[in-house]
């Protein structure tokens, strides 16, 4: 990822030394740093530096005097932001500036801040964090605590063998005040209805395309499910044209047996437009129930909550911003594509200012002081959420998105990247009359891109209630395939191209070409694959259509929460994960790709074929 030319950094370093000489000290091996200064009074203005190969702000704590300005110098080859963690009454950061690689910028809004300490971070690399101290200020702008003003909406549930959803534009309540937000929806809501299917019984879902003309042709992928290639939401074929419909057939079986109880989600998967179409609202949840899970005395009914966590940014009129309007320019065509201009790899990050749950910003939900089942889904286009509860109580994880674990795992934090899911039990007993906040906190492991810090939603705990649920010591987990000793295929995730001709996200050195098969495997065979990240950024790798076992992570046994079935894995820089599956039932082309959706759209996808 650091293959970009270093000339920009060298030139900007020279510029900084000339233009910011009073504020910078270049002595020693520590790189550029802000001079402490001999004055007792706080400086009126200050400079913040992001160094080449930047992973920190220098200095980590910077002080600005009343009415002063904060200048940011980015010597790195990545774009970065300086974004306030605290927000105003609309949920917007108190300050937020993007600083392109090899440039400088002034952080607007600092001069109006009241005295105090303000945490900030990089939206694109959340492990980068710092503190701004404002002194001697006459400003009155300060942080507003998140109010949790609107109730959580649980999407309506649709059951039955035949489901019909109209993809149409609709106005959706996302923010607590002001106009509703216009979105592209499945069935008029965001998220779309939660589809519930019975394992072993075919579910037929018809999608009718009535979205505006600019939506173009669409395709729907049932993420995590096992089905035929024609039903997989192919990125360039089997498309749904405007005014037309298509029925997808999901048998909900694997190898002739019913699929295990699962928590999938459905979303648009159109080539080059996946990030845009998901951002506009084409997402929904899908639950598979089986006989074994129904016999368990897990929380059910109103105490079984599917929660889709994502993020969006809004205009002053509560409409979605369009982060794709000024996107990069594609050079060439699929198979040889590269991208130039702003937002080209590795600076392609669709990050929202507001975290939303089931489509609403900062919702609250009233619960009794009993056990609840939370089905947690990260449907964000880029960000990871490291989830915890504000009072320190644990999650008891009973499953992944693809089935139950063999034994429950007690966790105080759940790090979910894009497309990852966790099935957990939370016991709210002992908290009557209290509020418990589900929050995302910085990840202590800073090897990768990191997780954003933000309140997610609030649980308002009421009185105790009768609770018949139980937490089994052992769960009916699906059988795992026996993994071969040898690796059949290695998939390497990195960046390709150069600054002059354009860059692209690559798998095994190549951008995606829908007409090229990068691996062929026999129907009925069992293969062990290695997923390897040689870039400087975390990726979340998703493999379509099979039931995958995590064999090892960096050569060692995976952690307990990765010992069930999976379809999406976190890969930090330098990591590798071995996975294995039996290629059952269906032949044809399937996809492997990064589920950071801009990465997928900008080349980090490959095709493999199952053949007879």
Where are these regions (language model features)?
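Secretory targeting and sorting signals
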Residues: 2-25
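Histidine- and aromatic-rich segments of cupredoxin/plastocyanin-like copper-binding domains
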Residues: 227-243, 249, 325, 329-479, ...
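N-terminal, post-signal-peptide metal-ligating segments of extracellular/periplasmic oxidoreductases
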Residues: 34-76, 134-239, 245-247, 335-374, ...
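Extracellular/periplasmic metallocenter environments
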Residues: 31-37, 41-44, 48-52, 99-142, ...
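Non-cytosolic beta-sheet module surface loops
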Residues: 73-76, 124, 197, 207-211, ...
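Active/binding-pocket-proximal capping segment
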Residues: 391-403, 534-564, 597-600, 609-612
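Short, hydrophobic/aromatic beta-strand segments
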Residues: 80-84, 176, 214-222, 280, ...
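Extended terminal and domain-junction accessory segments
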Residues: 135-168, 276-321, 400, 404-538, ...
